[in-house]
Amino acid sequence: EGARKIPVIAEVDLVVAGGSSRAIAAAVAAAKTGSRVYLVGYMPYLGEDICGSHLYEREAGEKLQTALARKLFPGKNFPTPLHIKKTLEDELIDNNVQFLYSSYVTNVLTDPSGKPAGVVIANRSGRQAIRCKAIIDATHNASVTGLLGAERKPFIAGSQEFCYTVVGNTPKEAPEIIQAEELSQPIKVGEKSYPVTRYTFHLPLKDDSYASLAEVEQIIRNRTWDIDQVDSSDLLWYIPKQTINSEKAYNGNPVSWRKLPMQAFKSKNIANLWVLGPCAEIPRELAAKVMRPVPALFIGEMMGETVARQIKDIPVPAQATVRQLKVNASNYGQTGELLSPLRPSLQKGFVDSPAGALPVLGSYDVVVMGGGTAGASAGISAAKQGANTLVLEYLHGLGGLSTLGMIGVYWDGFRGGYTAHIDKSVLAMAPKDHPRQPKGEGRFPADWKMEWHRKELLQAGGKLWFGVMGCGALIEGSQVKGVVVATPFGRGVILSKILIDSTGSADIAIAAGAAFDYTGKKTIAVQGAGTGKWAPGDYYNNNDWLFVDDTDILDVSRAFVQAKTKLQGQYDLVKIPQTRERRRVIGDYIISVYDVINHRRYPDTISYHKSSFDTHGMIIDPLFILNPPEKRHKIYDADVPLRCLLPKGLEGILTTGLGASAHRDAMPVIRMQPCLQNQGYAVGYLSALCVKENKSPRKIDIKKVQRHLVKIGNLPERVLTDKEFKGFSNSEMKKAIASVTDNYKGLEILLTDPERCIQLASKQIAGATMPE
């Protein structure tokens, strides 16, 4: 990684890393003393311990000793996820604590003496720095502590205890399950009641890599799922065996939580660094008790007050640079990323990041970044063709907006081909008379579809990591050789022969240097979006009530805050903004509105689409300004060529879905879920073929790919003989000019070639005579 400058977005007294309830308690307690505090959470919600690991119950003897604890657990019944998330969020807002969702701490800043001076975070907007005096590391595995080089006990491979909670189904048995406890209260939503089962597993943890934890997570999901399940933990709950080396280890059993010495939570060799998590140097049995939400809220509050007092008179370091390890490394290429300031008003200068190296977390034939509507299909397809495939997904389920986004009902779209296979297979997971079988076509229970994708991928030999965000690309010249990722364990590189960018907004292609188009520079037009409600068993809560740029982390965080107010009283909300427009890569070809309306054909068609112009807002193409679609729901069929999925100037990478190369007003016709599932399959198949034949996507025999796609029903047979469109003839243009005064008939032909249109129209006007 070459030297670079990281934009600074804030300067505060204290950074709290992590979005657990204990992290919020510490941040608020520090803020109440007058400290300026910034909290960074990597999930799209707060309370990752309670909501993420499903710890809504209080154990016997857990007393609500803080005001925040009493707000979170107001009665005997389990609180709802939305209550937890909004209560914690309100605490931060009411006490002027700045915070961001969906952001990973990837690096730390240090002053010239090596003391902490801030953090670097990664999110959909790129990477930014926050300067500070001190850090509370409230991550589950003390990952920030590791970035600073704090001493810790060595990792010992072996059996580890994991807890995982499911809602709705019956307890399962397996050799790895040592306990399956049905909790005292079911989850009640309206008139429905769902049992809750907490499993305890004993499973081997091979090493301290994120890959090993991801493997354990998939094993646990395999052992516990059935068709009656309506919810489950996002995050495994476990107490790591490895602890930090603290100022003073604590080996006792305190008579009260207040007696816990803060020295056991403070790093031994790094000043101004505290650990508020299970990696504190206390007995593992004690950590299992005090890191549960209720006790941890008390400890967090105590730590926030203590740290704020200790750093009150310390200045923010005048000099700060990104800490880079001095290591021997292989030169696979350079990392590309986004390093633009979030807002002009937030710009606080830059910090230097010296040249350094990133760990290689794995090497695969095909890597799919994003397991959404297209990405899940792409991963399954590549794996089924024998490619060594890894799918990386930020959320803890596959399917994206079609599942976790609660858009579980098709609108338009071509439903043949691989999509027909998905649809039939998902509904076949349960008997036809199962009470959750949907009424009507094109409807799919979200958790069934998520599980179908997951099992199909794993059964095909693919690997799956949840909780991972793409934050850059590894490039050598014009060749993309891998993806830079942020995980809860830190930042690293995953090498690929072919990288499929299924982020939905071409995040990785843009980080690699690809040009893109989006709202802002030319127009303020953006399609309407939503952030809908969710409750167990739901699969369709589509809505359109806000505008949001889901590549702007400030805007996304704002949308989640706004949604919680709008949805007060609901059980929960979605974990992904329901957006319809995102960044679109500039590919070898850009699909226009005229291509769609004129049914343009291509020799390299990769996916077939059917939809209306489902625009949800302002349109900007001159054709629509003059002649908007007359019928609300007229269906157009459109081809998408491979060229639109190939970022211009880059090799070894393809983009899918909403990140494809198309005009914003053409995108509504080619973004329907059924079509994108087919597109994902096609891209996965093509990528695996590229690996087998050692060819780039531009060099592959597209007819070979098309023949397979025609065979399975993805493409109409005509694509095998379709020719390149050479443009409309002069006679066709003249005919269109003659008819354009009749309610703009032929305008879609004329606007394909504005210069020729003007020439021919000018001649006709010059030769016209005024009627007497």
Please place each PLM-identified region on the residue numbering.
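Beta1/beta-strand and adjacent pyrophosphate-binding region of the FAD-binding site
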Residues: 6-20, 358-372
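Conserved beta-strand elements of the Class I
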Residues: 13-15, 38, 367, 390, ...
